[in-house]
Amino acid sequence: MKFGNICFSYQPPGESHKEVMDRFVRLGVASEELNFDTFWTLEHHFTEFGLTGNLYVACANILGRTKKLNVGTMGIVLPTAHPARQMEDLLLLDQMSKGRFNFGVVRGLYHKDFRVFGVTMEDSRSITEDFHKMIMDGSKSGVLHTDGKNIEFPDVNVYPEAYLDKIPTCMTAESAATTTWLAERGLPMVLSWIITTSEKKAQMELYNEIAAEHGHDIHNIDHSMTFICSVNEDPEKAESVCRDFLSNWYESYTNATNIFKDSNQTRGYDYHKGQWRDFVLQGHTDTRRRLDYSNNLNPVGTPEKCIEIIQRDIDATGINNITLGFEANGSEQEIIASMERFMTQVAPYLKDPK
């Protein structure tokens, strides 16, 4: 079993940027002290939904403060920056951390990112797939090459060389299209915390079928699952503190992107729009209903309840790499206390999939 801590770097109402950044750093250090395997970061721009716009810089800070903790991105918004620049950042972190950096990517969901950085949002899937292949191939060969599909430049040698033979990578996968693309290449995917156990199981079945058809060993691919987590002997307190955080967090999320508005005609995001329509039909756009939905899917409550929920998804998916977000627990002291309760009262009792 492996356990990660994901930090959203969200700015709750009433908190300053300095408070959010100080907490981000301390949670990274605490992750090593509590024996988490990985500390994960997320990229966001121009919104209080997340203050870490440059994950290479953020990860370098945490890597420099720790000795054994892996630090990763979940993920880099790949289409919005030049692949050569990203590859140099990636390789430098890989070398300076002696292989402790994990390169996780996403295609991006926030329209302002694409407008400001000068990228067509409707091309995000094609660019993400293209750039990811270029970077991963280049990390092995030492040469960055493009076929001119989305960007064109002459072949260049990239430095430094990779510290590891194979740089750890992953990609958040929500749609069938992304799942299929990753499966064809045998690449690890990250499963969302907002889908049900049956949906996770179906996603893994699709992935495994396609990956096996393409000759990949499905038992040797390091997928991960994400959860929102609050561990407390008082289940009502755990649910209450998550509600207080998530009600503001959800509002910030929907305000950060216009993809869910009826007037939005951006192509290429049919899965996300369909998921939102399902939420509307089920009443989950109502804040209370959506918080109930989230708490039912995620390990929020007593240690026993948290074990039951996570183990259920482990057995359904075969995934034993678990990533948890603890920021919904309130103050920094309460967040770290919940992290500690998880590592002492939940993690030791989780078992590899049946």
Curated annotation (Swiss-Prot):
Which is a GO BP term held by this UniProt record? bioluminescence
UniProtKB keywords: Flavoprotein, FMN, Luminescence, Monooxygenase, Oxidoreductase, Photoprotein
Q: Which InterPro entries match?
A: Alkanal_monooxygenase, Bact_Lucif_Oxidored, Bacterial_luciferase_CS, Luciferase-like_dom, Luciferase-like_sf, Luciferase_bac/NFP
Its UniProt entry gives the catalysed reaction(s) as:
a long-chain fatty aldehyde + FMNH2 + O2 = a long-chain fatty acid + hnu + FMN + H2O + 2 H(+)
EC numbers? 1.14.14.3
Q: Which Gene3D superfamilies match?
A: Luciferase-like domain
User: What molecular function terms (GO) are annotated for this protein?
Assistant: alkanal monooxygenase (FMN-linked) activity
This protein's record includes keyword Oxidoreductase:
yes
- SUPFAM superfamilies in alphabetical order: Bacterial luciferase-like (SSF51679)
Q: Which GO terms describe its cellular component?
A: cytosol
Q: Which PROSITE patterns match?
A: BACTERIAL_LUCIFERASE
Question: Is the Transmembrane keyword given for this protein?
Answer: no
Q: Which family does it belong to?
A: Belongs to the bacterial luciferase oxidoreductase family.
Q: How does it assemble?
A: Heterodimer of an alpha and a beta chain.
- Record's function text: Light-emitting reaction in luminous bacteria.
The record's section on PANTHER family has: BLR5498 PROTEIN, LUCIFERASE-LIKE MONOOXYGENASE
What protein name does the entry list?
Alkanal monooxygenase alpha chain
Query: What is the protein's species of origin?
Result: Photobacterium leiognathi
